[in-house]
Amino acid sequence: MTKLKDWPNQERPREKLLQKGTAALSDAELLAIFLRTGCRGVDVVTLSKQLLSQFGSLHALFAASESDFCEKKGLGQAKYVQLQAVLEMSSRYLQEPLSKGNALTSAAQTKAFLIAKMHNLPYEVFAAILLDTQHRIIRFHEFFFGSIDCATVHPRIIAQKVLSENAAAIILVHNHPSGDPSASEADKMITQKIVSALQLIDVRVLDHLVVGHKKCTSFAENGWI
């Protein structure tokens, strides 16, 4: 078996990244850089391909429990801890521009933050970004958990929080653990109920984002709000 050190420079993941950028690398090559080394008889790129095949995707590998992660050949508790640290740093990096007092100036940045924050959750969460009159962030607040439907989402509770924080506008968001960001009819009904309730206190709902795996659906962009 050819060892990784014997590969041409342009085919080694680290050298390829430096020459062509991160977008040029496959999932297996990116994972290989994270793992750094393979195991007996298996180079790190081959090991990465095997792990992706076993888990099904990078998303599934990242979301794996400690026990499921550590039982795989070539992994272990040290790698699990390292991965969790990387994921948390990524989340904080995306969240930093969306901290209290900063204005929302980019829809893409907002989506990236919400996807990073919510796409791995194994249960549904209904939340909102509360904004002041200049669309500066007051806070991100999680309202409801579990199966999200008209019976569990109460516009009155959202209105109370909005009033207590003196918010002028909000962006609604909830996740679909299935990974499918498509908005259901129930999602649209809930949104309309909240929009109607907040109109009574002169608070605008700027958007409702449905977060799936690596992407989200915007009610505003689809003309549903």
Swiss-Prot record:
One of its GO terms (biological process) is proteolysis. Keywords: Hydrolase, Metal-binding, Metalloprotease, Protease, Zinc. This is UPF0758 protein Ping_0056. Belongs to the UPF0758 family. PROSITE patterns: MPN, UPF0758. A motif (JAMM motif) lies at residues 174-187. It comes from the Bacteria. It comes from Psychromonas ingrahamii (strain DSM 17664 / CCUG 51855 / 37). GO terms for molecular function: metal ion binding; metallopeptidase activity. Zn(2+) binds at H174, H176, D187. Residues 103-225 form the MPN domain. CDD domains: MPN_DUF2466.
